[in-house]
UniProtKB/Swiss-Prot annotation:
Keywords: Ribonucleoprotein, Ribosomal protein. NCBIfam families: PRK00595.1, rpmG_bact. It comes from Mycolicibacterium smegmatis (strain ATCC 700084 / mc(2)155) (Mycobacterium smegmatis). GO terms for biological process: translation. This is Large ribosomal subunit protein bL33B. InterPro entries: Ribosomal_bL33, Ribosomal_bL33_CS, Ribosomal_bL33_sf, Ribosomal_zn-bd. The keyword Lipid biosynthesis does not apply. The gene is rpmG2. One of its GO terms (molecular function) is structural constituent of ribosome. Belongs to the bacterial ribosomal protein bL33 family. GO terms for cellular component: cytosolic large ribosomal subunit. HAMAP family: Ribosomal_bL33. It holds the Pfam family Ribosomal_L33.
């Protein structure tokens, strides 16, 4: 039970508007705010920012 509370599953949605999504886990203690990562978007075939969606 404790594992799910500390490291919840989050969706990372592309800011380019393609609708592409990554699914990952995050540590709430280290990252209490929303995550922003620069990852590869295969629809655009380039790296763009992905923001956490709740």
């Amino acid at each position: 039970m404790a594992r799910n509370e500390i490291r919840p599953i989050v969706k990372l949605r592309s800011t380019a508007g393609t609708g592409y999504t990554y699914v990952t886990r995050k540590n709430r203690r280290n990252d209490p705010d929303r995550i922003v990562l620069r990852k590869y978007d295969p629809v655009l075939r380039r790296h763009v920012e992905f923001r956490e969606e709740r």
